[in-house]
Amino acid sequence: MRLLVRPEEEELERVLRRSEMDVTEVLPDVERIFEDVVERGDEALLEYTERFDGVKLEAEDLRVSEDDFEVARELVDERTVEALEEAAHRIEEFHRKTLPRVDRITFDVEGTECGLTLRPIPRVGCYVPGGRAAYPSTALMTVIPARVAGCREVVVCTPPADNDVRASPEVLVAVEIAGADAVYRVGGAQAIAALAAGTETVLRVDKIVGPGNVYVTAAKLLAYSRGLTDVDMPAGPSEVFVIADDSANPDWLARDLIAQAEHDPHAAAVLATDSEEIARAVKERVEELLDAGIEREEIVLKALDRNGWIVVLDSLEECVRLANRYAPEHLQLCVENPEELLQDVENAGAVFVGHLTAVPFGDYATGPNHVLPTGGFARARGALGTWDFVKIIPIQRLREGDVERLAPIVEELAEREGLPNHAEAVRARRS
């Protein structure tokens, strides 16, 4: 990790420029895959599954059967099943408590009846990635809020695997616990194309959520740009930004940075502090842990070499300002008085308050969602939640008195915008 002590703005810009996910490089390949799936459906899915995943399936294998779920249960350790069930309970409880509960509200706007109604998105597709590792926790984090929101059908796509159930057994158990209606053994851009356009087997959905690699992200953006389906957010490499003072534990901080770095060679791990002593202690501890040997060491080393920074600034207020510019996926406040800093936090996917609140607790068990904006998108949105699975529909009702009051406004503005028939539609209703 690189240490910067009271850096100049040019050096801070280097910290802010973490790895970005450039979909333009893969977009031509994704477009070809997309068109092929739209044109040939299941046949294309089976070919891409064999080519990219090395798993040969028949059409009837695309959808996971009830027997497969039973076998998956037998393959997964009971302690893992119990952990998934306990995590699911907490995730569901959190999302039920954050569910917008208003079915319809009406109110008066200058004498006119207006209002809102909330409706669940009918069909949702959840992408649960494979690749470097299987992520059953992502199945919980995507399926549960959709189900809590009242979506009529919730389906899952996850990459196939070469085993007895031809998918991650842990993911299948998690999906069953979460309550999805169907699971398909298909991953990558082809999975997104199938969910967006539908095939003989895969149900076409109204929205796609869940993280994935650059091909998955490009496919989601392509599906959205073509008006086929809505999507949640682009997903880039994972990142953590830690703010610490001299009350922090250097060993804990070092392990927190390493934990984030193990996600991906392009992951980012940044520590900002007002204590040079803490900064040097954390850097030394990271090096000690790496020298002693850790699991996933190659990934961690690449990530910390590319996007690992320890920054010493003059005050914690400056650290918060830098964090707001960074807009991290995960923000940890490892300081003596975290509430004082929390009120100034503007941009973060999720905030972890206090020395005890390590990011992995939020990844798995506290309850809030771990599908979060990366790459600076926390400037504009926060975590996935039940609000992502409902539509807010405005309602308005005019009565005769409203027509006379509003018609002059509408007629004037419609004429100015060159839409005379808008004005005529209103004039026809005047007494």
Swiss-Prot record:
Amino acids binding Zn(2+): 260, 263, 363, 422
Record-linked Pfam families: Histidinol_dh
Record-annotated disulphide pairs: none
Manner of cofactor binding, per the entry note: Binds 1 zinc ion per subunit.
GO molecular function: histidinol dehydrogenase activity; NAD binding; zinc ion binding
EC number per UniProt: 1.1.1.23
SUPFAM superfamilies in the cross-refs: ALDH-like
Active site: 329-330
Binding site residues for NAD(+): 127, 190, 213
Pathway assigned to this chain's UniProt record: Amino-acid biosynthesis; L-histidine biosynthesis; L-histidine from 5-phospho-alpha-D-ribose 1-diphosphate: step 9/9
One cellular-component annotation, GO: cytoplasm
GO biological process, one term: L-histidine biosynthetic process
Cofactor(s) for this UniProt protein: Zn(2+)
UniProt: substrate binding residues: 238, 260, 263, 330, 363, 417, 422
Highest taxon of source: Archaea
Reaction(s) catalysed (UniProt annotation): L-histidinol + 2 NAD(+) + H2O = L-histidine + 2 NADH + 3 H(+)
Keywords per UniProt: Amino-acid biosynthesis, Histidine biosynthesis, Metal-binding, NAD, Oxidoreductase, Zinc
Family in the record: Belongs to the histidinol dehydrogenase family.
Function of the molecule: Catalyzes the sequential NAD-dependent oxidations of L-histidinol to L-histidinaldehyde and then to L-histidine.
Descriptive protein name: Histidinol dehydrogenase
